[in-house]
Regions:
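Sec-dependent N-terminal signal peptides
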Residues: 2-16
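Short S/T/G/P-rich N-terminal loop/turn motif that feeds into the first structured element of a domain
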Residues: 17-102, 111-261
């Protein structure tokens, strides 16, 4: 039950949940089919937890592309959404392997034996597993729902100054909100990392998330953007401060392929 040990966030992908566990998986070569079979078993467990009000939702994303040039890049990401840290911890503290098997067995209604379920979930399909607990610190409005097939852009950030979140909230967010209002972006969110498993990258302090609109583009340097802060000169200085406040460790484009809420 390694997945139970440490778990992440986002909307109705983050929006109704303030806490989430996000898990990035590198899948062993040739075992993608077995991994997806495993998630189809796990989703039955998540459906039950959602029905009982113990979590807000669960989503599975396929990593389409990343900026990672060295080492393994993740193949999939799962997002588990909760009302609070306490709710997340309470759900997992009351769970064990036998309870998990019983829940799944009941939900599949005889389609899978306990032996088959165990074989699927115990298969060694994951080469690595980076898990982060994240908390929402800022976002655009209104709240949104992602549809299966849509894409999301994820950026892993390393905070460089103490008031990094203030730069995102007071400079980046107003521009992103205007972009949402103009119909050129669906949603943006900023989350901070509050916990992680041993395999997770220790440098990462935050993630930013953007849900694009097909055929639309983000224009950071438009006249509309600079006018928010009094003109091109002032905006350029502020933009430099934002850039210096964090380092982008890596970026990825992900596609939503399964979702329960």
């Amino acid at each position: 039950m390694k997945k139970i040990i440490v778990l992440l966030l986002l909307s109705p992908i983050f929006i109704t949940a303030q806490v989430a566990s996000v898990d990035f998986f590198v899948i062993n070569d040739g075992m993608e089919e077995e991994y997806l079979e495993m998630e189809k078993v796990w989703v039955e467990f998540h459906k039950q937890m959602i029905a009982e009000g113990k979590m807000y939702g669960w989503s599975l994303f396929k990593v389409v592309s990343t900026s990672i040039e060295e080492g393994d890049s993740p193949d999939y990401m799962t997002l588990n959404r909760f009302e609070s840290i306490e709710a997340m911890e309470a759900m997992w503290s009351d769970m064990n392997y036998e309870k998990f098997l019983k829940i799944v067995k009941k939900r599949v209604k005889g389609k899978l034996s306990t032996r088959k379920i165990k074989k699927i979930v115990e298969a060694k399909v994951k080469k690595s597993h980076h898990s982060y607990v994240i908390e929402m610190t800022d976002q655009t409005v209104p709240s949104v729902e992602m549809e299966v097939g849509e894409f999301i852009q994820v950026d892993a950030m390393i905070q460089q100054v103490d008031d990094y979140e203030g730069y995102e909230t007071n400079i980046a967010q107003p521009i992103l909100q205007r972009t949402v209002n103009d119909g050129n972006l669906k949603w943006w969110g900023l989350t901070k990392v509050s916990n992680r498993n041993d395999q997770a990258l220790k440098e990462i302090t935050h993630f930013t998330w953007q849900i694009p609109i097909e055929g639309k583009e983000m224009d950071w340097w438009s006249e509309k953007s600079s006018s928010i802060f009094g003109g091109e000169f002032a905006y350029g200085k502020l933009a430099n401060l934002v850039g210096e406040s964090r380092k982008v460790l890596g970026s990825g484009k992900l596609q939503l392929i399964m979702s329960e809420k």
